[in-house]
């Protein structure tokens, strides 16, 4: 009996770090308080004892003081230039989505053999380093949920169909044709950087008409043939809590994506719909506990490790004076 990708990830993968360059990567733009998210993510990865660094793909409009905060938190700053798609005449779900096309630059980071991309509004509550050992040649991500009003322009939403629970509403083949391909949320991706892929992404994006969900739609189209779904535990989209609670066990969740309106911890708004739920407030509280934990600040963490594990501390110290303080040249391909 063939084991599914999901079961293979959870059951059979072993971690081997020797001679392999791996890293987490996130994306940062603008001069607002989004740096707080990256700090929270960096501290979350430390809390779960991840063995790998956090690279921050940073646009030129990120202030120097914000960059220094991230360096002080052990992040590796990687400067990138924006990627602009063709003009969108229909509009995006959110106006700021247009800048997210710049995330395509992470495929250029070929100094890493495998990377895990995480949006800034994500927190890691369990170690997911084992995902680096997924088979090469594929893009791994979690299936999205179509039940929120942000999907109102899609045929899935209009007929009440969601790929998270396809048994609830059968796709009407007679009237709408074949079911749509499985569609992933691009807030969390496991991928292998590759220059050929990178250059092709930049070429294809310039001849592809932008759509409602911007780079997420584009990535779904581009990687359709090599996409492999992984369990929702690796990217819990908030809407799953009230749309598909039968699929969710919070004790098993590794990664939480604070993407629902009002749910972002640094500007939590209990007045927004669903934000008065106790499970939401608990997850927001957990984010703040990590963010405010000074023992997870990079310097304090290294000092603690030096007492517990001198070898680990030596490696971390070398990183501090070597990799972390080095901001690589910007990409402008």
Curated annotation (Swiss-Prot):
Q: Which residues bind Mn(2+)?
A: 119, 121, 257
Query: Catalytic center at which residues?
Result: 103
UniProt-listed InterPro entries: Glyco_trans_8, GNT1/Glycosyltrans_8, Nucleotide-diphossugar_trans
Q: What class of enzyme is it?
A: transferase
Q: Does the keyword Cytoplasm apply?
A: yes
**Molecular-function GO terms, alphabetical:** inositol 3-alpha-galactosyltransferase activity; metal ion binding
Q: Which UniProt keywords apply?
A: Carbohydrate metabolism, Cytoplasm, Galactose metabolism, Glycosyltransferase, Manganese, Metal-binding, Transferase
- One Pfam family, short name please? Glyco_transf_8
Q: Which cofactor does it need?
A: a divalent metal cation
Show the coiled coil region(s).
Answer: none
Where found in the cell?
Cytoplasm
- EC numbers listed for it are 2.4.1.123
Q: Which CDD domains match?
A: GT8_Glycogenin (cd02537)
What family, per the record? Belongs to the glycosyltransferase 8 family. Galactosyltransferase subfamily.
Its annotated function is as follows: Galactinol synthase involved in the biosynthesis of raffinose family oligosaccharides (RFOs) that function as osmoprotectants. May promote plant stress tolerance.
Q: What is this protein called?
A: Galactinol synthase 5
Annotated source species: Arabidopsis thaliana
Q: Which gene encodes it?
A: GOLS5
